[in-house]
């Protein structure tokens, strides 16, 4: 199972939120490039980067900083937050970003995902499904749709998406453990798409359980920043 430490960027800093609430923001590192270097030096291979300003504004707000992370560290990077146009995706891929995550647009304009898949391929395009009580949340989690997470996942899989990131918003940043039941259900419904888990991870035992369920990767944020799981443990777990 792949482990992806997370860097959430807001106002140029690495931050953590609780349940996606921008009022509950903690700066975990003033210097995003420094944080990326810490991951690189620990032997981490792949990181998950979220442009929170971008998610709120619907644009690639921290694009230059993210391009700098790639240039400086050479880490494999997936990026999400504010992806609304094909040009943005093209731009991120052109500076060496490995995967781009489409979130809100998958719910509001599914055709956009199809267009991105046709142009860039399923290894470059990831769909992020964020849910509150099983219903998909959009626009930086400020809005909740009437679509449930399984329906959206199946629609995306049918379209050709091969990698989904599922975040349980109610667990994100809470350190209360992932919603294992949701992952089991999701994986049972899918036939070809793989799932990356995100939200609520608080101990190595969570990672073991997710691996057992059949999750392809896990994003780790607060558990690392709080000191509950070390980078050494994450590296060893990944093998």
From Swiss-Prot:
What Gene3D superfamilies does the entry give?
Answer: Aldolase class I (3.20.20.70)
Question: What InterPro entries does the annotation carry?
Answer: Aldolase_TIM, His_biosynth, HisA_bact_arch, Isoase_HisA-like, Isoase_HisA-like_bact, RibuloseP-bd_barrel
The reaction(s) this protein catalyses: 1-(5-phospho-beta-D-ribosyl)-5-[(5-phospho-beta-D-ribosylamino)methylideneamino]imidazole-4-carboxamide = 5-[(5-phospho-1-deoxy-D-ribulos-1-ylimino)methylamino]-1-(5-phospho-beta-D-ribosyl)imidazole-4-carboxamide
Annotated active site residues, numbered on this chain, are 8 (proton acceptor), 130 (proton donor)
Molecular function per GO: 1-(5-phosphoribosyl)-5-[(5-phosphoribosylamino)methylideneamino]imidazole-4-carboxamide isomerase activity
Q: Iron: present as a keyword of the record? A: no
Pfam families registered for this protein in UniProt: His_biosynth
Entry GO CC: cytoplasm
Pathway where this protein functions: Amino-acid biosynthesis; L-histidine biosynthesis; L-histidine from 5-phospho-alpha-D-ribose 1-diphosphate: step 4/9
Q: Where in the cell is it found?
A: Cytoplasm
EC assignment: the record states: 5.3.1.16
Coarsely, its chief localization is cytoplasm
Biological process terms in GO annotation: L-histidine biosynthetic process; L-tryptophan biosynthetic process
Which family is this sequence assigned to? Belongs to the HisA/HisF family.
Give the protein's recorded name: 1-(5-phosphoribosyl)-5-[(5-phosphoribosylamino)methylideneamino] imidazole-4-carboxamide isomerase
Q: Which gene encodes it?
A: hisA
